[in-house]
């Protein structure tokens, strides 16, 4: 049993990725934790009240450790009005947006969620999109909470360790959903997972977790061999029975292959990997002109919600990683974890 597994008394070196947007509710996270892996709740897009409700619910479903993921606000000021106007004209239903969440409101939301993690003594807190502020890190570490950072390069991983993270998740470019990158990129700098793991494992003194494109036990075995102490998986859990993902989202993943996904900024203003649909194809020429996150995300929210209600995959954000060809049927969390952790996995 390695250091990562010992921290949480795990029997399986797996983290269920904290996928925001209502996918990873307590039912999924608790099912994962109850099978000896680390379940995750995603606080992104939840109000503090809803997060507290979900924390209470998961404690009713499991006594095992789980983590809560928190988006670190980027603190970007509102874009120019003419840019906003242009996108309002191009995005269905975007004219319903009369105001945006202020930077101060984002930080208030962040600290309210940190307070809930402290209040309920949650075992682990992970961060995405940036380095967490030092005061939050200090409070959480003083309370004995294990801190997990997200990085897409060795440089980012080292900064996460320096900030006080106990574990760093290495997100390869194959990963579905939003990129955790937070340093300015130098051209096309998305690093693949197999190149990232050994370099980061050599450079860091804390455990590293591999994330991106892994679907079966061969990927888990490869990541552990290269120096990771665990593996974080999203797409394979997204299609499990216990997942709250939209049925259309699940079906599109089961039908797709590795060439059907791409990185896009169109839905949120931040790079995220998803299955290509009509909205992405029709607006591809605007990829470099989107509003920054979270402003673009706010403008597309009503469109995405309506598409979800109408089962219209062409305007939904169908996040998925590059390993999806191997996903062919909806199974239970228990079945998936048994497949991921076969007997030849050496920990």
Swiss-Prot record:
FMN binds at residues 69, 171, 176, 213, 232-235. It comes from the Bacteria. Keywords: Detoxification, Flavoprotein, FMN, Monooxygenase, Nucleotide-binding, Oxidoreductase. GO terms for molecular function: nitronate monooxygenase activity; nucleotide binding. SUPFAM superfamilies: Inosine monophosphate dehydrogenase (IMPDH) (SSF51412). One of its GO terms (biological process) is response to toxic substance. Its cofactor is FMN. Pfam families: NMO. Belongs to the nitronate monooxygenase family. NMO class I subfamily. P3N is a potent irreversible inhibitor of the key enzyme succinate dehydrogenase in the Krebs cycle and electron transport chain. P3N has been shown to be a toxic metabolite to bacteria, plants, fungi, mammals or any organism that uses succinate dehydrogenase. This is Probable nitronate monooxygenase. It comes from Bacillus subtilis (strain 168). The gene is yrpB.
């Amino acid at each position: 049993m390695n250091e990562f597994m010992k921290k949480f008394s795990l029997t399986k070196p797996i983290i269920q990725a904290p996928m925001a947007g209502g996918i990873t509710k307590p039912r999924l996270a608790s099912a994962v934790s109850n099978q000896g892996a680390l379940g995750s709740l995603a606080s992104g897009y939840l109000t503090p009240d809803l997060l507290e409700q979900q924390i209470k619910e998961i404690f009713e479903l499991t006594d095992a450790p789980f983590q809560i993921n928190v988006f670190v606000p980027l603190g970007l000021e509102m874009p120019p009005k003419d840019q906003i106007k242009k996108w309002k004209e191009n995005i269905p239903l975007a004219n319903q947006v009369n105001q945006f969440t202020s930077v101060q409101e984002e930080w208030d939301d962040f600290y309210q969620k940190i307070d809930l993690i402290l209040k309920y003594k949650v075992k682990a807190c992970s961060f995405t999109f940036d380095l967490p502020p030092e005061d939050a890190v200090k409070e959480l570490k003083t309370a004995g909470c294990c801190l997990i950072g997200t990085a897409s390069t060795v440089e980012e991983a080292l900064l996460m360790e320096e900030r006080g993270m106990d574990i760093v998740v290495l997100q390869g470019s194959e990963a579905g959903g939003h990129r955790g990158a937070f340093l300015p990129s130098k051209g096309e700098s998305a690093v693949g997972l197999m190149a990232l793991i050994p370099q980061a494992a050599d450079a860091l003194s804390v455990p590293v977790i591999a994330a991106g494109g892994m679907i079966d036990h061969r990927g888990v075995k490869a990541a552990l061999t290269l120096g990771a102490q665990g593996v974080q998986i999203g797409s394979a859990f997204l299609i499990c029975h216990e997942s709250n993902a939209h049925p259309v989202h699940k079906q599109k993943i089961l039908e797709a292959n590795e060439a059907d996904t791409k990185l896009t900024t169109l839905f949120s203003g931040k790079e995220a990997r998803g299955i290509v649909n009509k909205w992405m194809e029709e607006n591809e020429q605007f990829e470099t002109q989107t509003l920054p996150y979270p402003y673009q995300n706010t403008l597309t929210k009503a469109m995405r919600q309506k598409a979800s209600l109408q089962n219209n995959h062409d305007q939904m954000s169908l996040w998925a990683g590059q390993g999806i060809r191997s996903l062919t049927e909806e199974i239970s969390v228990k079945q998936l974890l048994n497949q991921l952790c076969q007997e030849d996995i050496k920990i």
